[in-house]
């Protein structure tokens, strides 16, 4: 009798272990990260490739899992209830009498076996598979491939019926594994929150992706701020301009910015003046040809142009061939570096925890990051916070004009001609 009980317990343990393997396979083979598996496969392990192959045809894998789970459950219930109930009844008969003992023993045996299967054949293995999907998947993929071979006729039968059902109702069974920019942002965000990525690395990655979305006008020096020399300037006018506004390169024009002849390296010009040389601003040996780019290019495209041409300075023109600004390699790279570098003049200055002073030329991306605003209305129509104010007010803003958007109030506090210089942003209570 003891040997029979031992054999029964051994059979139940074997069934629980079998069910645990299948349950863990059900979770682990469906959840491993494709990139992680490919990385493991590149190290020479063939098991990740087997997992990837199973993921390409999930129907057959799911079918064999369900066949095995149901077989084990039926066997476990039958063996457990019929084999254990006599022993439980014998224990009850030692203390009690009555016709209720047999059905009670069967119920106790059923509950006991069910609890064992739920705990050790389902919950624990699935929790382990969720926590270590790649490790568990690599451990069980061989067993599952063997099971699919053994039950191939049944797998084919059930999988065919399921496919007919899907085709009948036009349900796609193709798994979409395409990586989008949103997926990458989510992974980066999760890495930053988990501490895998440092704060600086987080900013760098986000800013690199911003380069494709942002146009060159978001970081250019605008037309009214361009420092230039006219070809007719005297030596004193040139020296006064250079002493007032020091830049490594300076634009040479012919009667205004809309006729740019090229640019000159400031240090070369100053060196020639210090050596008392006769300087002609239009001298071909001194004047360099400027790179002109349309204002529709993204920062990434401008960076590629700088790379291909060897230039680090470009003139930006609009569709009417009017100069709207200039951009340098340093301007583009400052977008990548973001908050890792300190600008001489910050676009956004925090007055206190509930208010900020913002330069009118601040790109929307900077405002959304600092104020944690998800998006601005119709933001494809403008690129700066000044453009947002004009769009919302539907007029040229003047002092004290304000806009309430979300939980913030945007108020114009300084203008110059038609340009917004500064905006005061304050936190307001949301209207109920």
Curated annotation (Swiss-Prot):
Xref: Pfam families: CBS, CNNM, CorC_HlyC
Major subcellular site: membrane
GO cellular component: plasma membrane
Gene3D superfamilies: 3.30.465.10, CBS-domain (3.10.580.10)
Residue ranges of every copy of the CNNM transmembrane domain listed in the record: 1-201
CBS domain sequence ranges: 220-279, 286-345
Lineage top rank: taxon: Bacteria
Annotated compartments: Cell inner membrane
PANTHER family the record matches: HEMOLYSIN-RELATED (PTHR22777), POLYAMINE EXPORT PROTEIN (PTHR22777:SF16)
Family: Belongs to the UPF0053 family. PaeA subfamily.
Identification of the protein by name: Polyamine export protein
Gene: paeA
């Amino acid at each position: 009798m003891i040997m029979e009980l031992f054999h029964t317990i051994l059979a139940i343990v074997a069934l629980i272990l079998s069910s645990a393997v299948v349950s863990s396979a059900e979770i682990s083979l469906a959840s491993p990260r494709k990139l992680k598996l490919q990385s493991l496969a590149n190290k020479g392990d063939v098991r990740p490739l087997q997992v990837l192959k199973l993921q390409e045809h999930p129907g057959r894998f799911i079918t064999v899992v369900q066949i095995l789970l149901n077989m084990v459950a039926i066997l476990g219930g039958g063996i457990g209830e019929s084999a254990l109930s006599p022993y439980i009844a014998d224990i009850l008969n030692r203390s009690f009498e009555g016709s209720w003992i047999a059905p009670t023993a069967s119920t106790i045996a059923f509950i006991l076996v069910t609890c064992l299967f739920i705990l050790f054949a389902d919950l624990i293995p699935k929790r382990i598979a969720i926590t270590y999907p790649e490790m568990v998947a690599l451990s069980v993929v061989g067993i599952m491939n063997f099971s699919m071979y053994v039950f191939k006729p049944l797998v084919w039968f059930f999988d065919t019926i399921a496919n007919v059902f899907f085709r009948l109702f036009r349900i796609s069974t193709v798994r979409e594994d395409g990586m989008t920019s949103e997926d990458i942002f989510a992974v980066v965000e999760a890495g930053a929150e988990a501490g895998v990525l440092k704060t600086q690395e987080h900013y760098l990655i986000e800013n690199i992706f911003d380069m494709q979305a942002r146009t060159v006008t978001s970081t250019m020096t605008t037309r009214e701020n361009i420092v230039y020399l006219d070809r007719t300037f005297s030596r004193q006018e040139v020296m006064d301009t250079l002493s007032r506004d020091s830049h490594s390169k300076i634009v040479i024009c012919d009667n205004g910015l809309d006729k740019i002849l090229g640019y000159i390296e400031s240090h070369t010009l100053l060196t020639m003046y210090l050596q008392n040389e006769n300087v002609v601003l239009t001298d071909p040996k001194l004047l360099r040809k400027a790179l002109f780019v349309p204002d529709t290019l993204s920062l990434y495209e401008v960076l590629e142009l700088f790379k291909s041409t060897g230039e680090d300075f470009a003139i930006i023109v609009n569709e009417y061939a009017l100069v709207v600004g200039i951009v340098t390699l340093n301007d583009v790279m400052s977008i990548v570096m973001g908050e890792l570098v300190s600008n001489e003049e910050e676009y956004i200055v925090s007055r206190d925890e509930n208010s900020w002073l913002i330069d009118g030329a601040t790109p929307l991306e900077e405002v959304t990051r600092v104020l944690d605003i998800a998006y601005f209305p119709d933001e494809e129509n403008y690129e700066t916070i000044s453009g947002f104010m004009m769009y919302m007010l539907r007029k040229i803003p003047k002092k004290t004009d304000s806009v309430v958007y979300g939980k913030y109030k945007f108020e114009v506090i300084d203008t110059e001609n038609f340009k917004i210089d500064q905006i005061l942003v304050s936190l307001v209570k949301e209207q109920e």
